[in-house]
């Protein structure tokens, strides 16, 4: 087993996991702010003013649906942050992280992409490919972590 390679692989996994964790913390803040904004729309005085606008997207039902979607995205961000933290902590100690953590992180990310597509299609605004620039970057980073993990696992198996 080449300890330099193990250190290098652990460093890559740790740094990318830290970056993804920070990205998810930003997502948590954004979702909380979005929830606050949506909650403001449910205040009776605001509802009275929205009734004069006659916008079909500003009904209580649509606002409630938006809140539900934001809550799901918030929970996804919280869960992903915990996963990336655990992966990063294992890598920091140069201990091979549990492979299931990577599988969970990839699964949660795939689920969030499906949720985003469904949300876009149900919103009536249509499909916008530009909304997937950052998810594509995150997918690339997750793939990089997974490939690095595989190399790290092979190096540890050489003992």
Regions from the language model: what does each represent?
Residues 1-44, 56-64:
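Cytosolic juxtamembrane helix and N-cap/initiation of the first transmembrane helix
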Residues 65-83, 135-139:
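Generic alpha-helical transmembrane segments
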Residues 50-58, 121-127:
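Membrane-interface interhelical loops and short amphipathic "cap" helices
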Residues 24, 97-104:
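Membrane-interfacial loop-to-transmembrane alpha-helix junctions, especially the N-terminal start
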Residues 37-51, 85-91, 150:
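Membrane-helix exit/juxtamembrane interface segments
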Residues 81-100, 139-159:
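Cytosolic juxtamembrane helix at the C-terminal end of the final transmembrane segment
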Residues 54-73, 111, 115, 130:
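Transmembrane alpha-helix entry/boundary detector in multi-pass membrane proteins
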Residues 27, 107-151:
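Alpha-helical membrane-associated segments of multi-pass integral membrane proteins
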